[in-house]
Amino acid sequence: MRLNTLSPAAGAKSAAKRVGRGIGSGTGKTCGRGHKGQKSRSGGGVRVGFEGGQMPLKIRLPKFGFTSRRALVTAEVRISELAKVNGDVVDLNALKDANLVTRNIQFAKIVLSGTIERPVTVKGLKVTKGARAAIEAAGGKIEE
């Protein structure tokens, strides 16, 4: 095999459709767009979700729910990731310093996923029941 003999596999590349090149090509004159109408025009076509004037499904269905603004600034931290935190005290600033959460995060919750070997003190963070049990089993403690 040489660089000058490399080529795509047979049938892997199809030739571009050449339109407007005569009747015999199959895509002459109207170029496969048919006659007249919105879709035949340059830049023609309908927007996404348009149903021809019928009330669209998106509008027929009721609104529901909302986007919690608190959820945007809340993060989950796995218990196994606490090993990356320097020191024995884990708080929001320690998580930010260890790059476990981004700078805009204001609230964090520690969840049970993985294991923890060293004892740590968790301050000012929410902790799930399972994570609380695992931290205390490792000799750590949780301070509200």
Swiss-Prot record:
For this protein, the record's InterPro entries field holds:
Ribosomal_uL15, Ribosomal_uL15/eL18, Ribosomal_uL15/eL18_sf, Ribosomal_uL15_bac-type, Ribosomal_uL15_CS
- Gene3D superfamilies tied to this protein: 3.100.10.10
Q: Which residues form a coiled coil?
A: none
Which regions are flagged for Gly residues bias?
21-31
Q: SUPFAM superfamilies attached here?
A: Ribosomal proteins L15p and L18e
**Location of region: Disordered:** 1-49
What molecular functions are annotated in GO for this chain? rRNA binding; structural constituent of ribosome
* Pfam families named in the record: Ribosomal_L27A
Q: Among the entry's GO cellular component annotations, what is one?
A: cytosolic large ribosomal subunit
- Record-level GO BP terms: translation
* UniProt KW keywords: Ribonucleoprotein, Ribosomal protein, RNA-binding, rRNA-binding
What does the UniProt function comment say about this protein? Binds to the 23S rRNA.
Task: Write down the PANTHER family for this protein, in alphabetical order.
Answer: 50S RIBOSOMAL PROTEIN L15, LARGE RIBOSOMAL SUBUNIT PROTEIN UL15M
Q: Which family does it belong to?
A: Belongs to the universal ribosomal protein uL15 family.
| NCBIfam families linked to this entry | rplO_bact
Summarize subunit and interaction data from the UniProt record for this chain.
Answer: Part of the 50S ribosomal subunit.
From the Swiss-Prot or TrEMBL record, give the protein name.
Large ribosomal subunit protein uL15
Organism placement in taxonomy? Bacteria, Pseudomonadati, Pseudomonadota, Gammaproteobacteria, Alteromonadales
